């Protein structure tokens, strides 16, 4: 099950040390930025409504401990936000129309910017022994949150931004994402990938 960080903040408002303890139990040995975000920035992003973060936990384990906060085990986490996808000029009008749903142009000009749901963070907890939660399960948790938003306000595409690494890009490709653009980021180039939301 997923626990909204906003709910955890509310539950620990009398004990900020407990909140820090829970969040600091997460580690990611593959990407320090993912770990740092949860430890240092997720709460601020939550308060500013820049992103919503969800902790993935074991519902049975929570019930066994009577939802005791200091015994929460984080198996993974996801963060979701809204973001504008700026499509490169070399992307075809056919693709632009597919993304927009109606047209490739507005007032005779190519549509360049599209609103998307961004899965900004997605990772399992390296510090949990025998943590068998899969990337596909984390993606499904993200989709569940996004679909609730889609039902309320609409939306056509989900976007991710990941390091330009073959294994990582292949994971997202297998799960329905396609490359749309690249981001120059010094020594760590990034790629943007998108996936159409079902029934959009």
Task: Mark where each language-model region is.
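His/Cys-centered metal/cofactor-coordination and adjacent catalytic loops
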Residues: 162
């Amino acid at each position: 099950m997923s626990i909204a960080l906003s709910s955890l903040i509310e539950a620990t408002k009398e004990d900020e040390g407990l909140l820090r303890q829970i969040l600091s139990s997460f580690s990611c040995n593959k990407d320090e930025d993912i770990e740092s975000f949860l430890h240092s920035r997720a709460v601020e992003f939550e308060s500013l409504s820049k992103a919503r973060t969800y902790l993935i936990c074991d519902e049975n384990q929570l019930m066994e401990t009577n939802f005791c906060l200091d015994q929460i085990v984080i198996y993974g986490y996801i963060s979701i936000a809204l973001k504008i996808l700026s499509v490169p000029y070399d992307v075809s009008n056919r693709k632009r129309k597919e993304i927009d749903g109606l047209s490739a142009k507005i007032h005779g000009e190519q549509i360049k910017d599209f609103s998307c749901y961004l899965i900004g963070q997605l990772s399992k907890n390296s510090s949990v022994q025998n943590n068998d939660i899969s990337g596909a399960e984390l993606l499904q948790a993200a989709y569940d949150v996004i679909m609730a938003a889609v039902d309320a306000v609409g939306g056509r595409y989900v976007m991710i931004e990941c390091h330009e690494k073959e294994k990582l890009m292949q994971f997202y490709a297998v799960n329905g994402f396609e490359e749309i653009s690249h981001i120059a980021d010094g020594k760590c180039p990034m790629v943007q990938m998108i996936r159409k939301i079902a029934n959009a």
